[in-house]
Regions:
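Active-site proximal loop and beta-alpha junction motif in alpha/beta enzyme cores
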Residues: 1-8, 13-252
Length: 252
């Protein structure tokens, strides 16, 4: 995605599987089931197909856990925020209601985009975020602003910031995994519980705590995420042998 190659991406997985199945690029040995390897680990997938269309994809994500509680960082011109940091395939700073932040609904998307990189930089400068079993996975990459849901049946709402200036239009698969891990660690979710997550535009993912797990000496969960994707087009890239830059170039 725009921020580079991540250890894991939930909405990207849902989209990729939908595209690959609908276009016949892969044929699973057992219809409706497959697994993929990601930098974060193996992800098991089920999908529901009606005719030639994939109507739902559910991924069983890597073990997810609460990394730290109550970390604080000062944002210049705004003030101090406290966050929990959880891992769901990427590290997320989760911003819940507090003195300077009541609900994401009080902020425009542009305001969240302005605050997020400052908060991320401050947290990365002050704290270390390293996966206990996969030390190559390190650094806080995403900010998850929370809020009350607006859609019927939703449990919670979020705005997930990533990259330089992007907010996820989906509820974010790894972000939903991280949020469920945070809530499970605090006794607010148990194995078998569902968690319906709403995005900034109102789209929904269906999360579920599938099992308990351990990551190093940390209690963790195995979350699953269900959602759908629709194809919107194809892009054709070709190489002109007359182009001296046909194979790319670097500036920085």
């Amino acid at each position: 995605e725009t921020s580079g190659c991540l250890p894991m991406c939930g909405h990207g997985t849902i989209g990729t599987i939908t595209m690959a199945i609908e276009n016949g690029l892969i044929t699973p040995r057992e219809p409706g089931k497959l697994s993929i390897e990601t930098p974060a680990g193996k992800v098991d997938i089920t999908y529901r197909q009606e005719g030639r269309f994939v109507e739902e994809v559910r991924l069983t994500n890597v073990a997810s856990f609460l990394h730290a509680e109550g970390l604080t960082a000062e944002i210049e011109g705004f003030g101090e925020l406290a966050v929990d940091v959880a891992y769901g395939g990427n590290f997320y700073a989760i911003v819940e209601p507090q003195k300077l932040f009541r609900d994401m609904a009080d902020f425009t998307a542009a305001e969240l985009v302005g605050l997020s990189p400052k908060l991320r930089a401050a947290l990365n400068a002050k704290y270390e975020f390293v996966h206990p079993e996969h030390p190559q996975i390190k650094g806080l990459s995403h900010i998850q602003w929370t809020g009350l849901p607006t859609q019927r049946g939703a449990t919670a709402r979020n705005a997930v910031f990533y990259g330089d200036k992007a907010i996820d239009r989906s509820p974010c698969g790894t972000g939903t995994s991280a949020r469920m891990a945070q809530l499970a660690a605090k006794g607010k979710l148990s194995v078998g519980d569902e968690f319906i997550h709403e995005s900034i535009i109102g789209s929904l993912f269906s999360g579920r705590v599938e099992a308990a797990a351990r990551v190093g000496n940390i209690d963790a969960i195995i979350p699953s995420i269900g959602g759908w994707a629709r194809q919107t087009g194809f892009n054709t890239i070709f190489i002109d042998d007359r182009d001296p830059y046909a194979h790319g170039f670097t500036v920085i």
